[in-house]
Amino acid sequence: MDLSKSRLAEKMLLFLYSLSKSSNTININTYKRYIYLYYLTSSFLTGGSDNIDIVIEKGDIRIIGFDSIISDFNSKEYIDIDGNSVIVNDELEYLVSPLLKNDSGAFSYQYREIQPFVNLLQSYSDQFVFTVFFSEPTFKEASLRGIKQMRSSNSRLKGLLSSFQAKLNNADIDEYDILTYWMDYILKNYYIETGENGAER
């Protein structure tokens, strides 16, 4: 497994661990969109430099390496797959929990970056996350221009959030606040106005 795929696998494992704290059953498409949005915002939120390659297919995305990593997790019995659902098994917690006991370790550091992001997205409904995904400027531009493959480092969302932060010029507002404001803007101007009610904070 190459380095970028290995890092993706670690993040996918930590996302599943974080998500399973509220429910062991996770919609695989929502999970994939969480990963996508995390990579497109991580350089803004945390200064991260990891990349994923993304293929745009029929108005949706395929993350290179995602399917094979999911299959690997399944074969190791960390998860079960039931249609569009990922069911997190106890084996995943048995693997991850001991690794997080070292507070100064790289795995724990990644978890502390991922956990607040998961908490933020989980405060919205899955349907709203779907709307955010289709309203995200990188995906919109790639779709309009007919781009079939891109790297997460080409994120237009990072620039949008950075510009918004610069205009506010307020040291008390952190990066997660900026992301929340953007998501609330989508909630008010796209989600509710198009009749997609039911988003819950």
Say what each PLM segment does.
Residues M1-R201:
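Domain-edge interaction signal
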